[in-house]
Amino acid sequence: MQKFLSLIIVILILYNIVKLKIYPEDNNNSTTIEQITSNNSSTNAHQASINNEPTISLNGNLFERTVSKIVINALKTEEGKVFFENILQPLNGPINPNDYTIEVHKDLVKTLFKINTFGSGNIGPASCGHVVTVFYQISDMNNNLISEDTKTFTLGSAPVMLGLDNVIIGMMVGESREAIIPAKYTVNNSNNTIFDDAYNYKVTVILKSILPQNFVKSNKVKIYDDEIAYRVPLLCGEKVSFNAKITRLSNGKILFDSKSTGQPIDMKIGDITYPLIFSYALQGKVQVGTRSVIAESKTFKALGSNLNKVIPHESLPIHEYLLLELNDFKQIK
C-alpha cells in the first residue's frame, strides 16, 4: 500500500508538471481564474468560520481529487505525518553508484512527540546513553500536574517514562522543551509513578547537565537511508537486532562486519558498551533498508569505561572518518 501510494504521488506530481509545461494558462484564463477565486474567497471564508475549520477546495479530475482526499486524511493522523516526513526528504548523491540514497534531514521523533525547543546552550547535544540531570514536569492533557522532579539518569533507562528519554535527546544544557507523550510511550522501568497507558501526557523538561562530554555533532555526521517506509521509528531504550559494518574511508579496510561472522548484534539502544554512534544512528531509524553513516572515528568509542563490544578503542584510527552501515533490522520485544 505504501509503495502504491508513493507511486501515485510521484505520478501526480510529474503529470501536473508536464501539464503546466505543455498547456500554460493564457492571460485571459489567468484573469478569469483570479476573478473566480476572488469572488469565491469571501464565500469560503464565511463557510470556514461556520465550520470552524478552513475550507479546502479540491481541483482536477475525479482521480486527482480522490488521491488528494487520501493524502489530506492521512496527514490528520500522527502516523500519516511521520510517513510523509519520511517521503518528503530530498535525494542526495549516492554513496553506492549502483543505488540511490536519501539524506536524512528530518527528525521523525520530533514529529512523533510534537517537540518544541526553547532557549539555547553550548554543551551537548545529549545522545541516547548519556547520563543527564533534568528537571521535568508531567501533566495530563488538561494541564493538571501529575509529577515533577529533578532526576539524574541514563538516557534509555526510562526511569520515568520512555517518551521522556526520547524528548531529551538532542537537547543542549540550558535548553527547555515541551512535548506530548503518546500513551504507548508512557511505560517505564521504575516502581515509582505508573502512568495510565490509555492517555497522552504533556511534558516540560529542562536539561541541567550531560556526562560524559563526548558528543556527536550533527554538522560532522552524514546519515543516508536507501529505503523509506510507513512505520514508526526506533526509539532510545528499545531493543533491536541488526547487522553492522565499519569501513575505514581512507583505504577501504573493513574494521568490523557482523554479517561475515553470522552473528547479528542484539542491542538496547543506549547501551554504553557499544559505540556511541550506534545509538545515535539507530534512534529514529525506520526498520527497513540500510542506514549509512559517515562520522568521526572518536564517535565509534563506547561511552562506558574501556569496554567496547564492537571494536577495541586501540584499534580505532585517530582523526579519521569512518563509514558505518546498519541493516537487517528486527525489533526485540
Swiss-Prot record:
What does it catalyze?
[protein]-peptidylproline (omega=180) = [protein]-peptidylproline (omega=0)
**Record keywords, A-Z:** Isomerase, Rotamase
Q: Name one GO biological process term.
A: protein folding
* EC number assigned by the record: 5.2.1.8
A GO MF term: peptidyl-prolyl cis-trans isomerase activity
Source taxon at top rank = Bacteria
Q: Indicate what this protein is called per its UniProt record.
A: Putative peptidyl-prolyl cis-trans isomerase RT0383
